Curated annotation (Swiss-Prot):
Binding site for ATP 2: T275, G276, T277, G278, K279, T280, W316, R436, K442, M443, R444, S446, H448, K450
PROSITE patterns found in the cross-reference section: KAIC (PS51146)
Cofactor(s) of this protein: Mg(2+)
SUPFAM superfamilies: P-loop containing nucleoside triphosphate hydrolases (SSF52540)
Annotated organism of origin: Prochlorococcus marinus (strain SARG / CCMP1375 / SS120)
Binding annotation for ATP 1: G34, T35, G36, K37, T38, S74, K209, L210, R211, T213, H215
Known partners and oligomeric status: Homohexamer; hexamerization is dependent on ATP-binding. Component of the KaiBC complex. KaiC interacts with SasA, activating its autokinase function and leading to RpaA activation.
Entry's free-text remark on domains: In the homohexamer the 2 domains (called CI and CII) self-associate to each form a 'donut' layer; the compactness and local conformation of the domains varies over the cell cycle and impacts function. CII has the autokinase and autophosphatase activities, both CI and CII have (weak) ATPase activity; CI has the clock pacemaker role.
Domain KaiC span(s) in chain numbering: 1-232, 246-501
Protein name: Circadian clock oscillator protein KaiC
Lineage: Bacteria, Bacillati, Cyanobacteriota, Cyanophyceae, Synechococcales
Free-text cofactor note: Binds 2 Mg(2+) ions per subunit, one in each domain. Mg(2+) is required for hexamerization and phosphatase activity.
């Protein structure tokens, strides 16, 4: 018999659980202080009431009901209104501030009856208990408390409600719960973490077990924003989006020719090169073409301020300010270090949802990669590209190469495998002078020009000239000239090798 699941309503978490939490069973949500355990349990109840019309009971062993209601308000959840509508009941089991003496044998019979009565009275389908740790802290006999909690869970299962219990742990990767017994009395275990990585906090959620059913394995990043918890279940993303044959212009006619007629409408383009090679200018031309077609576009800038972007675009004859005034362009500027990658991803998704652009640009990915782990950065890129493709948006990303000249790697963070089109921009030294070169390194699903061509930046924007004839190893950082005889000799040698094969 298949286990029925109850959607929590927490964005992304139900994807990790592959449908939600098992119905009529208990789930332990464990984490260190500040990981979001109480927020998780409140969001579970609030979404159940508001989205699934399932009344709930919240049992608090730590904070007072007044504090619970006040804190929930910061996420836009009006618990008092739900209480007034008899859709939510908050049972206060918090300790007496004046202290209390325990006489005789400890049991939770009275509390169990109060919870049972509230469930029946309000016809509750969901219960949240915050937290089990507080119960253990109030009483010394751990084995007795474990027995009583087991009784409580058994009663809740008998009634048929789906329960979420929180518990505190000491270390992010230590024992599941502080007293080492909480996980054994629950059917399911969810772990919330708030790990310090490169001087930044990164929140993750892991479903350790869902008894009798399947779930996704591993840790998944999440954020706590204005509307509560959002989980980024990247592993749940499916490659089911449609693929368009419609072409869009890059804003540079010669580059369109190099790409076989322009970019595909739903493609992700990456321009990579050293600083000053013209990446931001290509972004500006890409955005200008959207405006020319009366399409909306959005820019996420992590290296330059809005004023700098406007000034630079103006120098190329592009009026970003007018585009903004016409409601066809939105510019979001932020320091990469202002928040974590997951929060940046959530901001990008929110802005795209609200503005509904047909094109987006991120300048640059390398700025966001500073001071974060390779895995976290890769997850961010997958999240952005996946969402852009889901919304059928053309995306243009830039990446600043560390090497000023010579070859550089674009595969270290696996960005190259995620993007559809890659433009290589590079400085080259020819006859004692510095020049720029451009090459369409990759274009998925289309013919493209393989030549390395000269790339010139003028007051009117970019110009793409002919290829560097009679030169080879342009991108190696040490180009050298070949004579006409050498070139012809090379052709015959190549033909000779083919004949021998």
């Amino acid at each position: 018999m298949q286990v029925q699941k109850l959607p929590t309503g927490i964005e992304g978490f139900d994807d990790v659980c592959q449908g939600g939490l098992p119905t009529a069973r208990s789930t332990l949500v464990s984490g260190t202080s500040g990981t979001g355990k109480t927020v998780f349990s409140l969001q579970y109840l609030h979404h159940g009431i508001c989205h699934f019309d399932e009344p709930g009971v919240f049992v608090t062993f730590e904070e007072s009901p007044l504090d619970i209601i006040r804190n929930a308000g910061s996420f836009g959840w009006d618990l008092q209104e739900l209480i007034n509508q008899d859709k939510l009941f908050v049972l206060d089991a918090s300790p007496d501030p004046d202290g209390q003496d325990v006489a005789g044998n400890f049991d939770l019979s009275g509390l169990i009856e109060r919870i049972s009565y509230a469930i029946k009275k309000y016809k509750a389908k969901r219960v949240a208990i915050d937290s089990m740790t507080a119960v253990f802290q109030q009483y010394d006999a751990v084995y007795v408390v474990r027995r009583e909690i087991f009784r409580l869970i058994a009663r809740l299962k008998e009634i048929g409600v789906t329960t979420v219990m929180t518990s505190e742990r000491i270390d992010e990767y230590g024992p599941i719960a502080r007293y080492g017994v909480e996980e054994f009395v629950s059917d399911n275990v969810v772990i919330l973490r708030n790990v310090l990585e490169s001087e930044k906090r990164r929140r993750t959620v892991e479903v350790l077990k869902l008894r009798g059913t399947t779930h996704m394995k591993g840790e998944f990043p999440f954020t706590m924003g204005a509307e509560g918890i959002t989980v980024f279940a990247l592993g749940a993303m499916r490659l089911t989006q449609r693929s368009s044959n419609i072409r869009i212009s890059s804003g540079v006619p010669d580059l369109d020719d190099m790409c076989g007629g322009g970019y595909f409408q739903d493609s992700i383009i990456l321009a990579t090169g050293a600083t000053g090679t013209g990446k931001t200018m290509l972004v500006s031309k890409f955005i200008e073409d959207a405006y020319r077609n009366q399409e909306r576009a959005i820019i996420f800038a992590y290296e330059e301020s809005r004023a700098q972007l406007l000034r630079n675009a103006t120098s190329w004859g592009i009026d970003f300010e007018q585009m903004e005034a016409d409601g066809l362009l939105k510019i979001i500027c932020a320091y990469p270090e202002s928040t974590g990658l997951e929060d940046h991803l959530q901001i990008i998704k929110t802005e795209i949802t609200e503005f509904k652009p047909s094109r987006m640009a991120i300048d640059s990915l390398s700025a966001l990669a500073r001071g974060v782990s390779l895995n976290a950065f890769r997850q961010f890129v997958i999240g952005v590209t996946g969402y852009a493709k889901q919304e059928e948006i053309a995306g243009f990303f830039t990446n600043t190469a560390e090497e000023f000249m010579g070859s550089h790697s674009i595969t270290d963070s696996h960005i190259s495998t995620i993007t559809d089109t890659i433009l290589l921009l590079q400085y080259v030294e020819i006859r004692g002078e510095m020049a720029r070169a451009i090459n369409v390194f990759k274009m998925r699903g289309s013919w493209h020009d393989k030549r390395i061509r000269e790339f010139i930046i003028t007051n009117e924007g970019p110009e793409i000239k002919d290829s560097f004839t009679n030169f080879e190893q342009i991108f190696s950082g040490a180009p050298h000239r070949i004579s006409g005889e050498d070139s012809i000799s090379g052709v015959f040698k190549s033909l000779d090798k083919r004949e021998k094969k």
